[in-house]
Design a protein with these regions (language model features):
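Phosphate/dinucleotide-binding and metal-coordinating scaffold of catalytic cores
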Residues: 2-8, 16-293
C-alpha cells in the first residue's frame, strides 16, 4: 500500500488517540472534512492496517495490534450446560494497549486492558502457578501475578480450555476443549486424592486454574466436578491447624446452607495423613459449564 501524506496523518492521529477514534474525532484532529477523511481511510481499511468496528453512530476506526501467539483478532466461545460451544464475541487488541470487545448480543466496548468478563478466568494463586509450571513453552515466568494482560491473553488463547467459568478464548483453546474429556483428571473415589495431592505439589496435575493460595486440585469423582483443598501430611502444630481450618470451612458452609443461603456442597475426607475439603464446583455441570462473574 502506497501512503499519501493524508493517510500517514490519519495513522499518526489514530496512534495519538490511543488506537481508536470516531470519524468526527479524526476530522477534528486533522482539520479535514468527512469526505477527505473517508478517502484517506479507504486504502488503510482495504489493507487491514485500520479496522472499522461498531455500528451506526458508535462506529469507530481502530489500529489493530498483533499479539505473538494470539493474533490480531481473538474469538471467544461460550459453553452451555450441555457442553456445546457457541460464539460469545471477539476481541481486537489495539495498538494503544486497549482491547475492543464485541459480544454477539450487541454489546461493544473499549477496555483499557483485559475485559472484565475474563478477569476471573486468569490463572492465579496455587493453581495458577501449577498452570505456569505445566506450560513452560509459554515462556511467561513462573508467577502469573507478574504477567501482563497480553501474557494472560496468550495463556488463555493457547491453553485456556479448562479455566473457571464458561468461556473459552481463542481457536487453539477451543480445539483443546474438544479433546478435554479424554485428558481431564478423573478418580474412582476420594481414596485417590492422596496421589492427586502429591501430583499437585509437584506441579504436574492436569486441571483448571482456580484462584487462591491454599493447595488444591480439580478433578471429577462419581460424575461430579470438584475442587479439593488439602492439608499437609505432617504432624506439626501448623499442619494440624491447617486440617482444623479445612474442617471449620466445611462446617461454616454447611451452616450457611442450613440457613437457606447459597453455599457450595462440601465433604471432608481423611486420606494418607491429609485432610481433604471437597467442594462441588458451581461453574460446572455433568456435561457442561455455567458462567460466573
Amino acid at each position: 500500500m502506497s501512503s499519501s501524506p493524508l493517510t500517514t496523518a490519519v495513522l499518526t492521529a489514530l496512534r495519538a488517540l490511543g488506537g481508536i477514534a470516531t470519524s468526527a474525532e479524526l476530522q477534528l484532529r486533522l482539520k479535514a472534512s468527512q469526505p477527505t477523511v473517508s478517502r484517506a481511510l479507504a486504502p488503510l481499511l482495504q489493507a487491514g492496517t485500520v479496522r472499522k468496528v461498531g455500528a451506526a453512530r458508535s462506529q469507530r476506526y481502530v489500529l489493530p495490534r498483533h499479539i505473538p501467539g494470539v493474533g490480531g483478532e481473538v474469538p471467544v466461545m461460550r459453553v452451555d450446560t450441555q457442553g456445546q460451544a457457541s460464539p460469545f464475541g471477539r476481541l481486537l487488541p489495539l495498538q494503544g494497549g486497549g482491547i475492543w470487545a464485541e459480544e454477539t448480543d450487541g454489546v461493544r466496548e473499549l477496555h483499557d486492558g483485559l475485559p472484565w468478563f475474563l478477569n476471573d478466568m486468569r490463572p492465579q494463586g496455587f493453581m495458577g502457578r501449577t498452570f505456569a509450571h505445566k506450560h513452560p513453552e509459554l515462556q511467561l515466568g513462573a508467577d502469573p501475578r507478574h504477567w501482563s494482560d497480553d501474557d494472560v491473553l496468550k495463556a488463555m488463547a493457547l491453553f485456556g480450555d479448562d479455566l473457571p467459568g464458561n468461556l473459552v478464548v481463542g481457536e487453539a483453546a477451543l480445539q483443546r476443549f474438544h479433546t478435554l474429556p479424554a485428558r481431564a483428571s478423573k478418580v474412582a473415589s476420594p481414596a485417590d486424592y492422596a496421589e492427586l495431592a502429591e501430583q499437585a505439589m509437584r506441579g504436574t496435575l492436569p486441571g483448571s486454574s482456580a484462584g487462591g493460595e491454599q493447595p488444591k486440585f480439580c478433578t471429577q469423582v462419581d460424575g461430579r466436578h470438584v475442587i479439593v483443598k488439602f492439608s499437609p501430611a505432617g504432624t506439626s502444630h501448623v499442619d494440624q491447624r491447617t486440617r482444623d481450618l479445612l474442617v471449620c470451612e466445611h462446617l461454616a458452609l454447611q451452616t450457611l446452607a442450613a440457613a437457606g443461603l447459597p453455599a457450595a456442597r462440601t465433604r471432608i475426607h481423611a486420606v494418607a495423613g491429609r485432610t481433604f475439603l471437597e467442594a462441588e464446583r458451581f461453574d460446572r455441570t455433568a456435561l457442561g459449564r455455567i458462567g460466573m462473574v
